[in-house]
Amino acid sequence: FEQYTTALEMTLLAKGERGKKEALSKRVAVLLESDTQKIQDLYNKMKDFYRYRSESLHEGNGQNITVSELKDLEEIVRRVLVKYLEFCKVAIQTAPTVTWDTIKRDKISDLKNSVSTVISSGILPA
């Protein structure tokens, strides 16, 4: 469970970024969903998953994580990575010498803009 959330953090968060749970939950939701209810549902699910991850990592209590939740998170990570690879492919085709750091920075910027739009629309909390 912790490895999956770490993979999401490394992909969707800037180094040293604060408010990881909120930022990660919002970015995953807007990256993977477009329907209002699905965005809200995934946002809430990711917040729960991040809380489970924190409890498991910091308190050594991973008993609250079910097999179903583990499979859900695995599928979310798979979907995020597929979307990211598609974004990378387009970026490399456009600029063959682009670096991972630039691609990541650009994608995070895109996601921040998407999150701002969704917050402005009242779909997610500020």
List the predicted regions and their residue ranges.
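Amphipathic, oligomerization/interface secondary-structure segments
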Residues: F1-A126
